[in-house]
Amino acid sequence: MNTKWTETQKSAIFTPNCNLLVAAGAGTGKTAVLVERILQKVINDSEEVDIDKLLVVTFTNAAASEMKERVGEALSKLLELNCTSKNLQRQLALLNQSNIMTIHSFCLKVIKNNFHRIDLDPNFRICDDTESKLLKQDALLELFEEKYEEENLGFLNLADGYGGKNDSKLQDIVLSLYEFSQGSPWPKRWLQDVLKDFNLGSDFDFGDTKWAKVLMHNVTVELKGCKNKMKNILNTIENIEGLEHYLEPFKSDIESIDKLINITTWDEIRDEFIKLSFNKLPSKRTDPLVKSYKDKARNTRDEVKKKLISIREDIILCTDDIYENFKEVYPLMKSLTFLVMDFYEKYHNKKSERNMIDFNDIEHFCLEILTSKDKNGDIIPSEAALEYREYFEEIFIDEYQDSNEVQEVIMNMISRKNIYANLFMVGDVKQSIYRFRQARPELFLEKYNSYDEKEGSKNRKIKLSENFRSRKEIIDAINYIFKQIMCREVGELDYGEEECLKSSARYEPFEGNCGGDVELHVVDKKENENKLEDENEEELLDAISVEARLVASKINELVNPSLDQYSFKVYDKEIDNYRSIMYKDIVILMRATQNWAPAFVEELNNSGIPVFADTSVGYFQAIEIKTIISLLQIIDNPLQDIPFIALLRSPIGGFSPEDLIDLRVVNREISFYEILKAIKEHSLELKYSLEHIDERLEYKVEQFFNKLCLWRRKVIHMPIDEFIWHIYIETGYYGFVGAMPGGIQRQANLRMLFERAKQYKNISYKGLFNFINFINKLKSSSTDMGNAKILGENENVVRIMSIHKSKGLEFPVIILSGAGKRFNLTDINKSVLFHKELGLGPEYVNSERHISYPTIVKQVLKRKLKMETLSEEMRILYVAFTRAKEKLIITGTVDNIENTFQRWCEAAYCEEDKLPEYSLINSRNFLDWIGPAVARHPCGEIIRKVCPFEYNLNLITGDDSKWKVFVYSKDNFKSTLDENIDEDIIGKIKSLELDNNKEIYKNEVYRRLNWTYKYEQSSKIAAKFSVSELKRRFKLIDTENGIEFMEPIYLKKPAFLRESKGLTPSERGIVMHLVMQHIDIDKVGSYEQIKEQVDKLVFREFITEAEAKSISVYKIIKFFNSEIGIRMKKSNNVYREVPFYMEIESTELYKQLPQHIYRDEKVLIQGIIDCYFEENNELILVDYKTDHVGDIDSIKEKYQVQIYYYGRALEKLTGKKVKKKYLYLFSKDYILDLS
């Protein structure tokens, strides 16, 4: 292999006999390294490892397939170089049975090979996510019914306290806690352990608990924030004359806070907070000029005081009641944990009845097979695990940062220990963004912080930091931002020099518009106070649409630059050169696409930008899906008026609003179905009013009612998927939606519903009722499937996708939008919180007194979960930044630009390189992390200028990153993108001194009105000509220098003068060419032979009877008896109807164009050569003409252009010289030499 590996990559590839953690930063080639290590294992003669003796687990099926494919390609290339290698042949043969797979696939393989060890039926099946949800809901409803029947007091108290109005909240808690517990290797044991935390003994001391440790740390961070605010104000007022009397109180406050920060025990900090007091600020008249500083100082001190009092009242003193609170909370938590374990049993039984397992079972059953207990009850590898440990020579774990605890135990059970350590883990903890799937980045961090970088270590760490993806401008920006914001508190890793990416991507130097500074675009959502009174509501855009218009403007600037701008270029590896940017090079990334993507799609479409949003919502709201579901609902139960009316109004029903009114008038007390039935049957049993129902409506009712009855009979005997497709075709609805706007997407949605029904028939639920129930539960549980995907990878559209979906991908241009969107912290406000280490954090509830408030434990968990959520958000931001190859643009909106920039500058007002932890924790969105970092960059001057309060920030001047910061008002985007303005346009016009500059403006108006496009002639150059079109479009002129052309004027003969009797001359010519193409030239010696061949063409349906009659067999005989026909028959190589394409310079056709400007403009010439044959290694070209001609010289002039280009193309096509060029005129049986 010719890859040039870096030294650290070589170490990762060749380091033997150890547990190896490879911390591979974004774009550092981790997959290539992993593949190469696998290769070296199997091609190294000294090791003699077969590829099936290696276990390679990946995160996704796509990653596993790619890995296997890359290994296969590499082995094939090696085999080409050494085709006799038995080992390479063997490894390629073993590749298909290799263990390169997802962790779930491996676990499934273990289960299938060892099902007898856990008493599992070998014929089990895996239920999909939707069937699992349905089964869980059924199990949960049954469980709750049983508990109510038992009148279980603990359950009843639990339902009163946490159930809400209809127990739905308690059901959500049970399901959530069950799912969360599945992330533990032993879920029931974890539930039992967390319950013990609430059963307090008499010697309980909060200061000794795990909760106190977390709370102490959080309080310390908040205290540091308070101290920093006071220090910043003190630094500001120290140099302001007139505020000297504030210095001592502020210094005293800082000392008090410092004292609290340095306390290390809970009891001591509690005592100090109780004694905490604040001296009153001395009052003294000050100069009005310093009043703003005085007010700022007072307000900051009041804010700090309020914060400290809040900590004392809401946290410190709350611990005094913890013992009493826990006495009441413990029985509730006991009932909750027992309820979850009962649910586990019921759900497990339901799966067993159906002989199925779910995805959680796959890992847990595998774990059960691979573990056992020793005599002390400790977990040890089972016999099966030891067999796998012996079998696998090395275990590779890709994307290790996304592993969970269950997977960690599984890998530990089958990996070797001590001197035979064989675990290879590769990943990047900075890209761990799947905590919601129970991923545990702590597993990676534990090894990252404990493994040694020294060679020979049994637990070794190697860092890959050379980025081969992104331009230096992007790498510099990534390092600049994350060195300031990613720390152990927020991000769970201190991003220092060792974690910085190093730019190693190869981008050839280019003088044009490419790459460039990272751009930050901030829009102020605040309405303009001077807004015109007549502004209409349409222009009052919401924040998402405003940002979408900004993005559309930026995309158009890149893809469709104005005349005075150069086109943006991107480097294309396939052509190894720069090319103009295309829409498909641009991806808009969002934290979440729901609500945002539709607005962006609309605005981009309005701007003429093709766009595709990869969303997971909107499917069930599509009109075609709603219509079909309504149809299914009334087939199941026709008495439902809402879906019935929806169907009647749809194209399937075809009823008008007036029709529905007439039907409703029949009887207002009964359903529409009953009304239709009464009309159909002319029922006289009830006093219906049918007089106003005319024959037309009666006929329509009868037709619809008959169809409905037929469908209701058919659905009983047909599988649901077949029935749905039958409906599509019988009603013609599938074709109908295909003709609607967005028809391809709509038909894809219908096919997706059909496929979903196909999957449904394979699950344990059957029938139309259950299918409708299944769909309704999907809708109610927010499991929207998203629109069906209809775009391929190479469609030239801008893509909108979530940051999560972009992980592992790369794109030339990334626009990170929605950077001002608030972080979603709703999960930390639930009534019961869960944490792996800290256990349960419930609300204190008292149903009798109707009170509830968060326990101190819930406050601890809330703070801890907020930190972990923010850490995840920071890693998500890192993933977004590192997707960009050549250009990174960040956009976001803020509520008030001045207040926001002041907040940013205040956060950036610190001496350390890292931004303060408290400001990172209190950030609301991505912009609150990016903004302060950019504010202290030299390029962030606009942030510092707009900030209403002057901060003397310590600028970071030694950094290589380059930024462009743009600030907009919401008013900039009121109308269309082309109408964007930088300031109030009315005021701008009024400020112009028109009287003093009339002549200047007059000249400018004339200049603009008389402007002509410099290259207008190029717009008239055709991209492609056929040779015959060339002959028609241009008139030949003979000059001394060769052939020139001029465009003639043609006047068409009026239609009424044109006759149409039989075949036209053109049609007769086509038929003659067809016969001459297919005729066998070895059988043209007589009339009968040629006639027989023409008849065969009729029989084979090449031509019709009428067309055959237009053929003159005698004309064909004369051709083959002519000089040129005889020469053709003698040739061994005759070619007929040969198509060609040839590029020529546009100036060759358009002589009026300047040569130096249009030399590179090409025109494509295409045509079909009737016949050519070889003669003495040279070519003879023959073109047939069936026209009725008069003057031979006029024919020569008419066709010379065509034959000229035929000859030129033929020489270029074959590389041989064309010796002679002939026209054969069938009308005169004449050969014309045009050589």
From Swiss-Prot:
Keywords per UniProt: ATP-binding, DNA damage, DNA repair, DNA-binding, Exonuclease, Helicase, Hydrolase, Isomerase, Nuclease, Nucleotide-binding
GO annotation, biological process: double-strand break repair via homologous recombination
UniProt-recorded Gene Ontology molecular function terms: 3'-5' DNA helicase activity; 3'-5' exonuclease activity; ATP binding; ATP hydrolysis activity; double-stranded DNA binding
Gene Ontology CC terms, in alphabetical order: cytosol; DNA helicase complex
Catalytic activity: Couples ATP hydrolysis with the unwinding of duplex DNA by translocating in the 3'-5' direction; ATP + H2O = ADP + phosphate + H(+)
Primary role: The heterodimer acts as both an ATP-dependent DNA helicase and an ATP-dependent, dual-direction single-stranded exonuclease. Recognizes the chi site generating a DNA molecule suitable for the initiation of homologous recombination. The AddA nuclease domain is required for chi fragment generation; this subunit has the helicase and 3' -> 5' nuclease activities.
Assigned protein family: Belongs to the helicase family. AddA subfamily.
Name this polypeptide is given: ATP-dependent helicase/nuclease subunit A
Organism annotation: Clostridium kluyveri (strain ATCC 8527 / DSM 555 / NBRC 12016 / NCIMB 10680 / K1)
Gene name per UniProt: addA
